[in-house]
Amino acid sequence: MCLIVFAWKAHPRYSLVLAANRDEVFDRPSARLDYWDDHPDVLGGRDIEKGGTWFATNVDGRWAAVTNFRESQPAAPSSWSRGHLVSGYVASQASAAEYARDISEPLPRYSGCNLLVGDAQALFYASNRDQRHTGARIEKLSPGVHGLSNHLLNTPWPKVQRCKRSLQALLGAGKSGISDDLFHLLADRTPANDEELPATGVSHTRERMLSSPFIVSKGYGTRASTVLLVDNDGTCVMQERSFGSDGIELARRTKTFRRTDRRN
């Protein structure tokens, strides 16, 4: 993923409200949202090239998502696949707390990334690029609205701030059906003003192109928007909208399930 905004235990009906965009090169093969053949309890898209995923959930309510940390130097070809951080959790039996503890040692071996791992009890954020921490940063998150892109959690990049404000306003409006509104905030193609752009080591032109929540460019852009809603009673709705290289919507998928009691 390249943009994730979420409300954790901050809504009277939903324990989790999450909206995310996946940005990727268009020639990298991937599978759309579905249950996995090799792990039938896991629901998510999948990276065909490496076998991992950017965002997935288990029917027991555990979920995870990863974003790359933007750096001027591309990841080395031998780097461990960051998508396996997500698949390794949702295909396991570990709780969020257990996985966050266990991942702290190997996480620095991966290229720059951020990881969210959650279950019904807790939500953890992990990063291997926070210079204030030796090795990995592991943090248990408090209830509230958070945003994550290709830097650290809640870094005030324009698109993160914009989408967090939109999510907070949506939650405050008290609407019962919010999926379309979440997809609307993810569909924003407005770039940030030049004076607001972060300096991440890429060219000014690319920095501006990457600054909108929804990205359209030749060969690279937003390939999927995903919404996950988890009711307080355990009903989970995961929705995905897929896009082509021109930003035109290609498909929609919705999966609904009731969280099992196997773990939570």
Predicted regions and their residues:
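N-terminal nucleophile
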Residues: 1-264
